Amino acid sequence: MAEHGLKIAVVGPQRTGKTLLCRALAEQPILLGEMSYQPTAAVRIQEISRVLGIDRVKVQFWDVSGSVQYQSYWPVLAKEVDGLLMVIDPNRPEQERDLETFYRNFAEPNNLYTRQCMVMAIQVQKEGGGLGGWQGLQGGLKKLSQSYVAINPANPAAGVQEAYSHLDVLFQGALQSKKEALESSYMNQEDQ
């Protein structure tokens, strides 16, 4: 089984559930109650392993702060990103403009294809909460893959399973692009 590594930047406005998602995926403890929201200072990195077909993939989630206070760090954090997961609060469609800024700063400098980018609306919910009715993106980013996931911080397993059903598509797209880039670099070396 071949092993590969992927760097996935997880970006979006503040308080959209980026850290909750990353911690849940990495099976890390999730804070509840008064201490449940702790703003990310610049970046948090979580790692997971996935098996995609014949490939074992070590995924690093770079959970990037949504605060403009850390915007000067974005070029460094965006360096060599293999994929981009943009997170939005489905109850705040005005955040779509913010996602366009993240796209320009993370996807465009890395020449990411649409298969390497995804928008995920995360509904943080309590037991028994419904999924709501997010209508998806309406602007320039509507060409990207979009998903909607509900996560209950007290019991995130169902939300994690749903998230993986979408994220595996992102991982496969990022892995395919990475393999193609490696193959191209090998071909160029042979030509010299």
UniProtKB/Swiss-Prot annotation:
A GO-annotated cellular component: motile cilium
Question: Where is the protein found, in the record's own terms?
Answer: Cell projection, Cilium, Flagellum
Disulfide bond residue pairs: none
Q: Which Gene3D superfamilies does the UniProt entry name for this protein?
A: P-loop containing nucleotide triphosphate hydrolases
Residues where GTP binds: 12-19, 62-69
The main location class comes to other
Q: Which PANTHER family match?
A: DRAB5-RELATED (PTHR24073)
UniProt-recorded name of the protein: Intraflagellar transport protein 22
What is the species of this protein? Chlamydomonas reinhardtii
